């Protein structure tokens, strides 16, 4: 059931993140967001506080490979610097989608949602709880485990696992 109605424009949701790399937790949120929106824009954010392992283009290709069968419904874009809520408006999005893993995520996300609401009332924030089996993983943790030779095979897609191996064990 999407938020699209017969007489309205297709519904668009923006799911932002650094996705460095994309994990099965991210994929779960994107797949569930597709049940709510006609189109999900996966917005690769540039975060000046984070030093990414993968370039923006590498992350874009990584994500697109995960969703080859959903081409057209999932659009991957690298977001230039600026306010995410403004990007959402430019894309015609009705909502910003955020995944929550724990209560500690909610505090920060709640502040962001309120600020975005103050800036642009027409864009909603939608929170999706990460599936229980992915609740403990993060991109940072995945990179750390991979760098130190741990098994991440059930936490990321195979092509992402290979790319991490290439980065850490060329």
Curated annotation (Swiss-Prot):
CDD domains (UniProt xref): PPAT
Source organism: Desulfotalea psychrophila (strain LSv54 / DSM 12343)
Residues involved in substrate binding: 18, 50, 84, 98
SUPFAM superfamilies listed in its UniProt record: Nucleotidylyl transferase
HAMAP family: PPAT_bact
Organismal lineage: Bacteria, Pseudomonadati, Thermodesulfobacteriota, Desulfobulbia, Desulfobulbales
Gene3D superfamilies xrefs: HUPs
Stored PANTHER family: PHOSPHOPANTETHEINE ADENYLYLTRANSFERASE (PTHR21342:SF1)
Site feature (Transition state stabilizer) residues: 26
Location(s), subcellular: Cytoplasm
Pathway linked to the protein: Cofactor biosynthesis; coenzyme A biosynthesis; CoA from (R)-pantothenate: step 4/5
Keywords, sorted A to Z: ATP-binding, Coenzyme A biosynthesis, Cytoplasm, Magnesium, Nucleotide-binding, Nucleotidyltransferase, Transferase
An MF annotation (GO) of this entry: pantetheine-phosphate adenylyltransferase activity
Stored InterPro entries: Cyt_trans-like (IPR004821), PPAT (IPR001980), Rossmann-like_a/b/a_fold (IPR014729)
Chain's role: Reversibly transfers an adenylyl group from ATP to 4'-phosphopantetheine, yielding dephospho-CoA (dPCoA) and pyrophosphate.
Cofactors: Mg(2+)
GO biological process, one term: coenzyme A biosynthetic process
UniProt name for this protein: Phosphopantetheine adenylyltransferase
Catalysed reaction, written as an equation: (R)-4'-phosphopantetheine + ATP + H(+) = 3'-dephospho-CoA + diphosphate
Annotated positions binding ATP: 18-19, 26, 99-101, 109, 134-140
């Amino acid at each position: 059931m999407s938020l699209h109605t017969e007489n309205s424009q297709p519904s668009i949701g923006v799911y932002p993140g650094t996705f460095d790399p994309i994990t099965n937790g991210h994929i779960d949120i994107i797949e569930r967001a597709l049940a709510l929106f006609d189109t999900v824009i996966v917005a690769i954010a540039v975060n000046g506080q984070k030093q990414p392992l993968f370039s923006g283009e590498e992350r874009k290709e990584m994500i697109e490979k995960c969703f080859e069968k959903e081409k057209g419904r999932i659009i991957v874009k690298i977001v230039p610097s600026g306010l995410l809520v403004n990007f959402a408006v430019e894309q015609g999005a009705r909502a910003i989608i955020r995944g929550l893993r724990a209560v500690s995520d909610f505090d920060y996300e709640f502040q962001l949602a309120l600020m975005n609401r103050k800036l642009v009332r027409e864009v909603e924030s939608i929170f999706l709880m990460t599936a229980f089996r992915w609740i403990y993983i993060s991109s940072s943790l995945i990179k750390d485990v991979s760098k130190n030779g741990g098994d991440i095979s059930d936490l990321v897609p195979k092509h992402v696992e290979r790319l991490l191996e290439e980065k850490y064990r060329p």
